[in-house]
A protein has these predicted regions:
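N-terminal, charge-rich interaction modules
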Residues: 1-62
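Long, charge-patterned amphipathic alpha-helical coiled-coil/hairpin "stalk" segments used as oligomerization
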Residues: 59, 65-127
Length: 127
């Protein structure tokens, strides 16, 4: 069994007028599929997506149509650092407008949070 190394609390920055959605997925094509889901759910939505790979070089894949939101998503994903986690920042839409579209992406397994309120993520670390 992996050795438990502790718990880390990650503060997720959420600028005024922005919402964040954090979830889990299991496929390398997640970013492309989430991009399509968001852009078709709400015309005019602004967003940034980041996804942490779980193997290999453990890259962070990202995309979006707003540079500020892409940077926020990348930094939040990097801070969380857990494989298969995705972070989406949205503007000009609400989570209720996109959650069903996100949940219908076949590789999405779970939504952990969708909010504009202060948010922390608790990460358990092992070796």
């Amino acid at each position: 069994l992996p050795e438990f190394q502790g718990i880390e609390v990650i503060q997720i920055p959420i600028p005024h007028g922005v919402n964040v959605i954090i979830g889990q997925s299991h496929f390398i094509k997640t970013v492309e599929d989430l991009y399509e889901a968001l852009i078709t759910a709400v015309p005019g939505i602004k967003f940034g997506i980041a996804f942490c790979e779980a193997s290999g070089k453990r890259l962070i894949r990202y995309d979006g149509n707003d540079e500020e939101l892409k940077k926020l998503a990348i930094e939040a994903a990097r801070s969380i650092g857990a494989g298969h986690v995705f972070v989406i920042y949205i503007r000009d839409a609400w989570p209720i407008n996109v959650l069903n579209a996100i949940k219908n992406v076949q590789e999405v397994t779970r939504i952990y949070a969708a909010t504009a309120n202060p948010l922390q993520v608790i990460v358990g670390k092992t070796d």
